[in-house]
UniProtKB/Swiss-Prot annotation:
It holds the Pfam family OSCP. It comes from the Bacteria. SUPFAM superfamilies: N-terminal domain of the delta subunit of the F1F0-ATP synthase. Belongs to the ATPase delta chain family. F-type ATPases have 2 components, F(1) - the catalytic core - and F(0) - the membrane proton channel. F(1) has five subunits: alpha(3), beta(3), gamma(1), delta(1), epsilon(1). F(0) has three main subunits: a(1), b(2) and c(10-14). The alpha and beta chains form an alternating ring which encloses part of the gamma chain. F(1) is attached to F(0) by a central stalk formed by the gamma and epsilon chains, while a peripheral stalk is formed by the delta and b chains. The gene is atpH. InterPro entries: ATP_synth_OSCP/delta_N_sf, ATPase_OSCP/dsu. This is ATP synthase subunit delta. Gene3D superfamilies: N-terminal domain of the delta subunit of the F1F0-ATP synthase (1.10.520.20). GO terms for molecular function: proton-transporting ATP synthase activity, rotational mechanism.
Amino acid sequence: MSVADTIARPYAQAIFEIAIENNTIEKWKNILIFIKTIASHKKFKNFLSGSISPKYLSLIFITIGTNIIDENAKNLIKLLSENQRFNILNNIFERFVKLEACYKNIIIVQLKSAFSLKENHINKIRKVLERFFLKKTKIIYKVDPNILNGMIVKVNNTIFDLSAQNHLKQLSDSLNF
């Protein structure tokens, strides 16, 4: 786990607890997307370098997002500004999404294949994973031409490498002792 992930964890946890308490998970997801979109804008990055005061920086965010930002979001923006933590917004968002998935009993699966899979193949993979993990499954699918053939499935910290490249490596390792 990276340092940014470690720092982001308590922020995401606090935001998620507020979202659960107020039944506003989707709203908070949109707020986090909004804040990280503004913070990552190339014209806005100059402000994040510390050249302006945290109070003024907070005011800019709050002014831009008047229609989406409530009191709790204002407090988050002020806290991120005072602690100079806008650089970990992606980590906070990713952690928030993982907390939501866990709360809704969903696992997030990253699936990579050497070539494009049809939707019915992805659905078959989803069904197998749902039976295996006994949870609903959300698949994030990408084509990776670097994989010779087959696929790689990543669930949390577990990787199922079903690629030809991995099979060749295992064969090579077994022949080389």
